[in-house]
């Protein structure tokens, strides 16, 4: 464990000079310092003894100061590791009383940010909510806008995870108000903060599948030019944009967005890059592209990643119209692929696409073909075959009719040929018109 992690990423050697008073060489300060470091030495081997020892730092300090603040940070961490959450909250509330005058504004801000980041690893949502709300209450008097914004953003993310959208919208309204001019317009000087708010709001609309509001906000976020956004924030925005486009059937736009999201996540070191790469593969298959998504320089290193391998194999089976292999991969890697709700949402469409391609190839030599035979070849029920045939006939992929009594598909090759000749005739007429126009101009 590094010193940085050891002290909530705010260790004693950070850019903070202890502000001793003129009598900083007096005995009480030396005693405090010794007591603090002796306590810290106990932390790993005997955390309970360390807690008692840190308590002595608080008793020795008299007036609130930096050593008491540091001791409380350590006590919060130890209690967190011991899962003694009520005591941890008590110590955190005690630490928040120090931020008004006992330590500098920058130091308190860095420390609280680090504590909140550390505690956010907890899966106990109620505990996190109490932490964030307690921090916001303490900040009412402290007037620290940056810390208020960051804490509210964390609370908003918590509400998003808990699907408490009413509470999240209230947070979003407050965040928006903090980034507005006197005229009520977005303050473009606060572009980076605005993008953070948009990212949070876009995630909410994506979860709610509210594409109308999502689209407007997504376009708005891409037009903010006054910010140097964190790649993680842009990754979130582009991922949500990709989901929006995919749900609207705009597969090429979705592919572009997922690729941009993947690159941003990759740059920020976010594990979300793997998930986004899966979405990129999904969009690639839905747009019926013959290009392998792993041919790109950015995606190639992940081709054999265990998390991605199933999707890589799925692409291969899909491009080869190998329905048996496609279904086998889905079955073998069910949790890897189907546990993601967004992928699961679109797998049926992929199956329909590959079944349609196999179906077209299967029926090509025939004028009449038994539906049970198609059912056996596609490995789906007769009812599902009929449903697929109806869809293909309606969109003119197949020219024919279904004889349900005799369970036959009767194909009209003449009609299909007629349609081809009609298209050729139209094309010939267009060429003649173009030729006449060129001759007229040259005359």
Swiss-Prot record:
Keywords linked to the UniProt accession: Cytoplasm, Nucleus, Phosphoprotein, Signalosome
Annotated InterPro entries: 26S_Proteasome/COP9_Components, PCI_dom, TPR-like_helical_dom_sf, WH_DNA-bd_sf
Keyword Ribosomal protein: no
GO process terms (BP): inner cell mass cell proliferation; negative regulation of transcription by RNA polymerase II; neuron differentiation; protein deneddylation; protein neddylation; protein phosphorylation; regulation of protein neddylation; signal transduction
Ranges of residues in domain PCI: 254-416
Pfam families given in the database record: PCI
Modification after translation, per record: Phosphorylated by CK2 and PKD kinases.
Cross-referenced SUPFAM superfamilies: TPR-like, Winged helix' DNA-binding domain
Recorded GO MF terms: transcription corepressor activity
Disulfide bond entries: none
Keyword Cytoplasm in record: yes
Mediates interaction with NIF3L1, as annotated region: 1-275
Subcellular location: Cytoplasm; Nucleus
GO cellular component: COP9 signalosome; cytoplasm; cytosol; nucleoplasm; nucleus
Top-level lineage group: Eukaryota
Role description: Essential component of the COP9 signalosome complex (CSN), a complex involved in various cellular and developmental processes. The CSN complex is an essential regulator of the ubiquitin (Ubl) conjugation pathway by mediating the deneddylation of the cullin subunits of SCF-type E3 ligase complexes, leading to decrease the Ubl ligase activity of SCF-type complexes such as SCF, CSA or DDB2. The complex is also involved in phosphorylation of p53/TP53, c-jun/JUN, IkappaBalpha/NFKBIA, ITPK1 and IRF8/ICSBP, possibly via its association with CK2 and PKD kinases.
Sequence similarity: Belongs to the CSN2 family.
Protein known as: COP9 signalosome complex subunit 2
Designated gene of the protein: COPS2
